[in-house]
Regions:
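Short, glycine-rich nucleotide/cofactor-binding loops
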Residues: 4-18, 49-50
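Short, catalytically relevant binding-site loops at active-site mouths
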Residues: 10-12, 41-44
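Histidine-anchored nucleotide/phosphate-binding helix
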Residues: 17-30, 36
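Glycine-centered flexibility sites
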Residues: 31, 40-42, 58
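Short internal beta-strands
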Residues: 34-39, 76-78
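N-terminal beta-loop-helix "entrance" segment that forms/cooperates
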Residues: 42-56
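A glycine-rich helix N-cap at a beta->alpha junction
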Residues: 52-78
Length: 78
C-alpha cells in the first residue's frame, strides 16, 4: 500500500509533531511505501537543533524517530 502522511504540527506541540515520523516507521516496517509531507510549522522539525529538542510525551524523542525514518529511506517532502 502507498501511504502519504502530512503534518503541519511544529515543535510547540511535540507529541503531535512526532506522530508522522512514528507512523511512517510503523508503515515502513510493515512493508508499505510511505512518504512524509511537512508544511507550515512542521518544516522547522528538519533542523537538527529543533529535532533534538522535541521530546513527545510517552514516545521516543523525535531525533530517534527521524533517524529511523531516514534509515528506512522514507522520502520527506518539505
Amino acid at each position: 500500500m502507498k501511504v502519504l502522511i502530512k503534518s503541519a504540527w511544529g515543535s510547540g506541540q511535540p507529541t503531535e509533531a512526532s506522530f508522522p515520523f512514528h507512523h511512517a516507521n510503523a508503515f515502513a516496517e510493515a512493508g508499505h511505501q510511505v512518504q512524509v509531507f511537512l508544511l507550515g510549522e512542521a518544516v522547522s522539525l528538519m533542523r537538527t537543533v529543533v529535532a533534538n529538542a522535541v521530546v513527545p510525551v510517552g514516545w521516543a524523542p523525535l531525533s530517534e524517530a527521524l533517524a529511523k525514518v531516514i534509515a528506512h529511506r522514507v522520502p520527506i517532502h518539505v
